[in-house]
């Protein structure tokens, strides 16, 4: 409980400091928000975890990516640099933690964990495009795998991040949450990337869909745009309804992963198809479908 109180207080203080120092996420052609917002939520969560979870290995492995995200917030780093550093952290984790990597029980080479980790951390970053979405997804995910301090740290930040957000997570926050929950999920599922993927099913769906969508229209798959699921949904039905719907889908994916039933992958595919169909209906509108 103290984590929530401290996180709330830190967010308040850091928000004031960010405004005075002009450390703000300003609107531009790549972003959907219409005003400058302090991107210090990740910093407040990090400092809270530093107090309560400094010996937690998942937190320790997340520190380099938190710093990477903070530098990205400050200097807008190249995606190549971010991919390289994320891959190095994945290699570090895979060599430091003695678990056998598998997919639904079938053992695989550890290099697949590196690929999976890089993709998942970037998936969390992609999902952080709607007020409260990544925070809500991460809150339920952390609760379900017993990461209590992380959950309470998010709870303290969440009131600042709900629509219309007064404070953003920033890339420092999305990278921190992505690294922490990816590593924690893999260990929770004893190295099984299949069940970890089901558990973190919404970020995984969004990164795969975004990648394929851009390739179909012959665009750089790493280039940002405003055609993600949360962007299209929020433009048509509003931020709050979108937030409730997508967090609910993420919660269902969490439960599918926790079940550890192989055949639940079919339910996952069905739910993804529902998301995709709804996306196409909303995106089509009165004209042609635009990916």
UniProtKB/Swiss-Prot annotation:
Pfam families: Glycos_transf_4. This is Undecaprenyl-phosphate alpha-N-acetylglucosaminyl 1-phosphate transferase. It is an enzyme of class 2 (transferase). GO terms for biological process: capsule polysaccharide biosynthetic process; cell wall macromolecule biosynthetic process; cell wall organization; lipopolysaccharide biosynthetic process. GO terms for molecular function: glycosyltransferase activity; magnesium ion binding; manganese ion binding; phosphotransferase activity, for other substituted phosphate groups; UDP-N-acetylglucosamine-undecaprenyl-phosphate N-acetylglucosaminephosphotransferase activity. The chain crosses the membrane at residues 4-24, 32-52, 57-77, 84-104, 110-130, 138-160, 167-189, 194-216, 237-257, 262-282. The record marks 72-73 as: Important in orienting the substrate. Pathway: Cell wall biogenesis; cell wall polysaccharide biosynthesis. The keyword Magnesium applies. Its EC number is 2.7.8.33. It is a multi-pass membrane protein. Catalyzes the transfer of the GlcNAc-1-phosphate moiety from UDP-GlcNAc onto the carrier lipid undecaprenyl phosphate (C55-P), yielding GlcNAc-pyrophosphoryl-undecaprenyl (GlcNAc-PP-C55), the lipid intermediate involved in the synthesis of various bacterial cell envelope components. The enzyme is highly active when tested with C35-P, instead of its natural C55-P lipid substrate, suggesting that at least a 35-carbon chain is required for the lipid to be a substrate of WecA. Its cofactor is Mg(2+); Mn(2+). InterPro entries: Glycosyl_transferase_4. The gene is wecA. The record marks 128, 131 as: Could be required for catalysis. Optimum temperature is 65 degrees Celsius. At 30 degrees Celsius activity is only 7% of the optimal value and at 80 degrees Celsius, the enzyme is totally inactive. It is found in: Cell membrane. The keyword Calcium does not apply. GO terms for cellular component: Gram-negative-bacterium-type cell wall; plasma membrane. Keywords: Cell membrane, Glycosyltransferase, Magnesium, Manganese, Membrane, Transferase, Transmembrane, Transmembrane helix. Partially inhibited by magnesium at concentration higher than 10 mM and totally inhibited at concentration higher than 250 mM. Also inhibited by tunicamycin, NaCl and KCl. It catalyses: di-trans,octa-cis-undecaprenyl phosphate + UDP-N-acetyl-alpha-D-glucosamine = N-acetyl-alpha-D-glucosaminyl-di-trans,octa-cis-undecaprenyl diphosphate + UMP.
